[in-house]
């Protein structure tokens, strides 16, 4: 059923565009535009652990935060026909960026609202992040000064982090928050990677007045497939956790404003907000010290939200 639904979603722009105008479709291979921009990426990504044997309550959460990572972003769009456009876009970080990670556990089932263990890692790096997007648009309105259309596409994004050093407050079996200390500076504590794969649908449009232009895009997916990999490097607790979550929700809103410095060239600024909401999924672990493994259904949660700001140049050939 989901495969049939997805097929309908992906063909929607083509079907609508074929009925949106009574004019004959014409092939316009020369109508291509490309843009390039520089900007920053900020946000937070979260991983959660749940215990099914305790009613699925949350027992652990790691928050990975990053701010103002430099990125380069680009896109190319081809108006294949007046009613149909295809495009490709993507961005990548230009280098690693400092961040912060907080790891909290709630191990006391009799007091589930109070954390028992916490570690803080201000020496955290966003190693890299990137994204690519392939899409097709069907234009319901396509006039020289305004456009409005439906879109569908496929998008993937990746994030990688490493936390080093830091401090901790743990609870022993006999006490509560009674074990306080720090990790060696520069020593790897945890490495974490997230990946999101999603087909999506959306709405996009723009409006031009003289040399000024405003545009916006909304995207939604209910078919996100998220996966992650968590490496605990502590020699006494060398464990790899892997999780997979299906059918998460994704929302994205993008707004841009630009000015045409020539008939074909536009400078612009843009802001984009993205969010993948939390949902439970399956997780597995492998203990490297004693060579044992375990699997838990609905034992993990994955979440991500970020904000991108860019400034760039768009040129129509």
UniProtKB/Swiss-Prot annotation:
Enzyme class (EC, first level): hydrolase
Active-site residues per Swiss-Prot or TrEMBL entry: 103, 105, 230, 232
Keywords recorded for this protein, A-Z: Aspartyl protease, Cell outer membrane, Hydrolase, Membrane, Protease, Signal, Transmembrane, Transmembrane beta strand
Reactions catalysed: Has a virtual requirement for Arg in the P1 position and a slightly less stringent preference for this residue in the P1' position, which can also contain Lys, Gly or Val
Protein name: Protease 7
Family the entry assigns: Belongs to the peptidase A26 family.
Name of the gene: ompT
EC number of this enzyme: 3.4.23.49
Functional description taken from the UniProt entry: Protease that can cleave T7 RNA polymerase, ferric enterobactin receptor protein (FEP), antimicrobial peptide protamine and other proteins. This protease has a specificity for paired basic residues.
Residue intervals passing through the bilayer: 32-41, 70-78, 84-92, 131-140, 146-156, 198-209, 212-221, 251-261, 265-274, 307-316
Top-rank taxon: Bacteria
GO CC terms, sorted: cell outer membrane
Residues in the signal sequence: 1-20
GO MF annotations, alphabetized: aspartic-type endopeptidase activity
Spans within the Extracellular topological domain: 42-69, 93-130, 157-197, 222-250, 275-306
